[in-house]
């Protein structure tokens, strides 16, 4: 599944419009290039409709909101819906402030998303209308664990069914569901929490995956999540040369 989805990205080179945050914009662009996609960044309201029109997908990330970018998100999102383009929402920090929460909830209500990807606290905020997000990180009390896995799976399947899109909850254990099926992915790495932006990068990459695999959004999303975890695993695992030097 991963190989086929990634091969389709490399073969089709999907152009992805990213309205993302200022902290990770360069990293998101580079990850899109690395996986085989093509990035373009724009949040100016007078520009976004034209940019969205020439792209195959739209990645909306609310990490550094301002009035201009919020307006641009709604214009781009509605244009993407009009053109039947694939759209992903990354509700960064939803639950941490009224502006973030209100914006994320309104986006989810007014725009038809194919995928919503976030940590467990952000997704709970969207589903329940309030949350306990710790800044832009998930609250420890919300974390998906082996002990609460059944409840977490039931929650994500229920919200996916109600929202009508694929929901991806990422963390130490990742959950990806369309309301009927749920992938449980256990290749998260603790090192990923030591740098900022891995979630933002994943959202950009996931958008490329769903554009290149339009008939298999659930599988494409799960494949993107797996790919990110495997990339981190390969990077953090000692090479044979490193192991020999450590003896």
Give the positions of each predicted feature.
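Conserved small/polar residues in nucleotide/adenosyl-binding loops
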Residues: 235-242
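Conserved phosphate/ATP/ADP-binding segment of small-molecule kinases
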Residues: 100-182
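Short pre-catalytic strand/loop immediately N-terminal to key active-site residues, enriched for Gly-Thr
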Residues: 186-196
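Active-site cofactor/substrate anionic-group-binding motifs, chiefly glycine-
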Residues: 36-78
């Amino acid at each position: 599944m991963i190989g086929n989805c990634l091969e389709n990205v490399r073969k089709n080179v999907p152009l992805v419009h990213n309205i993302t945050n200022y902290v990770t914009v360069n990293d998101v662009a580079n990850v899109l290039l690395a996986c085989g996609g093509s990035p373009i960044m724009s949040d100016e309201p007078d520009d976004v409709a034209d940019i969205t029109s020439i792209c195959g997908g739209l990645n909306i990330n609310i990490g550094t909101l301002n009035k201009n970018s919020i307006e641009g998100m709604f214009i781009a999102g509605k244009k993407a819906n009009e053109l039947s383009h694939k759209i992903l929402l990354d509700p960064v920090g939803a639950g941490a402030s009224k502006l973030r929460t209100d914006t994320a909830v309104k986006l989810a209500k007014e725009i038809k998303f194919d995928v919503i990807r976030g940590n467990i606290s952000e997704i709970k905020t969207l589903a329940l209308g309030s949350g306990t997000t710790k800044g832009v990180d998930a609250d420890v009390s919300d974390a998906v664990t082996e002990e609460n896995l059944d409840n977490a799976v039931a929650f994500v399947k229920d919200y996916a069914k109600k929202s009508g899109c694929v929901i991806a909850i990422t963390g130490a254990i990742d959950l990806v569901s369309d309301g009927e099926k749920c992938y449980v992915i256990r290749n998260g790495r603790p090192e990923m929490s030591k740098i900022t932006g891995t979630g933002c990068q994943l959202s950009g990459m996931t958008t490329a995956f769903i554009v290149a695999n339009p008939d298999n959004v659930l599988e494409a999303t799960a494949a993107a999540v797996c790919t990110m975890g495997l990339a981190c695993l390969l990077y953090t695992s000692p090479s044979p040369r490193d192991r020999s030097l450590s003896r």
